[in-house]
């Protein structure tokens, strides 16, 4: 069976991994079954209704992930693209870290840090991001006393990964190419 899996396209393997993870969660927590509906879209979702950027702004996204992430339309477009590839966990982690930095209450910060860790960092997390062991260790140490910078090292690694891998795929995608025509 494993030899057969190797022959499948990468997107099929990613989808299978996502289904396996969600089924595992479902078996552990049947009361949350409604949250685990697995949508399958042939085409990416349209971005949320925001002001469409100019062509010049959109062209800047090719060279700057930060400019893309700072633009609501660009962020929504990028997120839709990543969802269509079943690879949105890195962006979701980055966004969760941005929201986390804004928390003022130490109690809320500790609760949110635990949720982010359990959802994205720990081994076999539902949306585990691809970071090295050293970065995980630093993050775990930072979470002993949660602060706004607890996830900074991991967030920077994920940002670099998105810049190197996800952004070029987005720029080459039909989704972006149609947008800049």
Curated annotation (Swiss-Prot):
Q: Which GO terms describe its cellular component?
A: cytosol; intracellular membrane-bounded organelle; membrane
Q: Which Pfam families match?
A: RGS
Q: Which organism is it from?
A: Bos taurus (Bovine)
SUPFAM superfamilies linked to this entry: Regulator of G-protein signaling, RGS
Domain of life, source organism: Eukaryota
Q: Which residues form the signal peptide?
A: none
Q: Which residues form the RGS domain?
A: 64-180
Q: What does this protein do?
A: Inhibits signal transduction by increasing the GTPase activity of G protein alpha subunits thereby driving them into their inactive GDP-bound form. Binds to G(i)-alpha and G(o)-alpha, but not to G(s)-alpha.
Subcellular location as annotated: Cytoplasm; Membrane
Sorted alphabetically, which PANTHER family does this protein's record hold? REGULATOR OF G PROTEIN SIGNALING, REGULATOR OF G-PROTEIN SIGNALING 5
Q: Which InterPro entries does the record associate with it?
A: RGS, RGS_RGS5, RGS_sf, RGS_subdom1/3, RGS_subdomain_2
One GO biological process term is: negative regulation of signal transduction
The alphabetized UniProt keywords are: Cytoplasm, Membrane, Signal transduction inhibitor
What is the protein name for this chain? Regulator of G-protein signaling 5
Q: Which CDD domains match?
A: RGS_RGS5
């Amino acid at each position: 069976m494993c030899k057969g899996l190797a022959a499948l396209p990468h997107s099929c393997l990613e989808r299978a991994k996502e289904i396996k993870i969600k089924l595992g969660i479902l078996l552990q927590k049947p009361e949350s079954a409604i949250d685990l509906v697995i949508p399958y879209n042939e085409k990416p979702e349209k971005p949320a209704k925001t002001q469409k950027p100019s062509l010049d702004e959109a062209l800047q996204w090719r060279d700057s992930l930060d400019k893309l992430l700072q633009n609501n339309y660009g962020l929504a477009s990028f997120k839709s693209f990543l969802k269509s590839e079943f690879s949105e966990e890195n962006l979701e982690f980055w966004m969760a870290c941005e929201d986390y930095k804004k928390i003022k209450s130490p109690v809320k910060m500790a609760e949110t840090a635990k949720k982010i860790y359990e959802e994205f960092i720990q081994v076999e997390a539902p949306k585990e991001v691809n970071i090295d062991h050293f970065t995980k260790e630093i993050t775990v140490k930072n979470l002993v006393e949660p602060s706004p910078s607890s996830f900074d090292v991991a967030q920077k690694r994920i940002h670099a990964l998105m810049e190197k891998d996800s952004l070029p795929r987005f720029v080459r995608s039909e989704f972006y190419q149609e947008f800049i025509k």
